[in-house]
Amino acid sequence: MSVKIITPYVFEEEIKEHQELFWELNIHYEKDIARIGSDLMFQKIWNQYPKDDIFILHADMSPHHEGWFEEVLEYVEQYPEAGMFGCLLLYPATDKSGKHYIQCAGGKFTDERPDHFGSGLVLENRGTFKSELEVDTGQYNSTREVAWTTFGGCYIRRKFIDSVGNFDPSFEWTYNRDVDYCLSGRQNGFHIYQIPIRLFHHESKDNKRIKDESKIKMETRNLARLQTKWANSKFYKTLDKEIKNR
């Protein structure tokens, strides 16, 4: 099975730098002209490659080290039972000791809401929305099964996509569609693994700049839809299970 790397984007001027950073990869870039949101752009592009696995690479990501994508493919081959793999995403920012803050080491649930292992930093103003930020000390260096993973730095097998189909059309714009998609895949019998391949991620750089009051309301409605659909199911619970090396 071949894999297609996809990167939807909004701002033309930033893609040249992205192409330079990931020059060795054959990436499908496509501009979100209609502003349908990143989720529906993922779907639009992956439907253009119906026989390929998909790797979602955001426009605000950068490589952590050389050879990272080959390492991702090794994990994909090593764990055939997993339908989706999430990379370890780091903010391009460090603490005083030089350790990077973790943006996402997999998805979990906190107070009935989707949350990340990590996150909490707002790079635009160095503000925070969590009481404590988590730094990368190697605590996520193992392969772990998680409840869901964010659709960025994410490898999705074609059979996972074929099983779930398109995104639930009742969701709007973006945010929480990826959570719903992951839970739907798990309901269909797939596993989601978090792997210790690091990428830098600014986090929602495009979405933050085009967000307005109407989109904030869409996010709120999406959360309500997600909770109505899944909150009483066994899948709407944090999962953090270490997987043995093969």
Where would I find each of the regions flagged by the language model?
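A conserved hydrophobic helix/loop-capping motif in glycosyltransferases and polysaccharide synthases
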Residues: 3-14, 75
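Short, well-formed alpha-helical segments that are part of the catalytic scaffolds
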Residues: 11-26
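Active-site nucleotide-sugar/metal-binding loop of Leloir-type enzymes
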Residues: 42-53
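Short beta-strand-to-loop acidic/aromatic patch adjacent to the donor-nucleotide binding site
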Residues: 52-62
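Conserved donor NDP-sugar-binding/catalytic core segment of glycosyltransferases
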Residues: 62, 66-117
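A short, conserved alpha-helix in the catalytic core of glycosyltransferases
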Residues: 72, 141-142, 147-156, 160-165, ...
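Active-site-adjacent helix/loop segment of glycosyltransferases
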Residues: 90-95, 99-104, 144, 180-246
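A recurrent flexible, glycine/aromatic-enriched loop bordering the glycosyltransferase active site
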Residues: 116-156
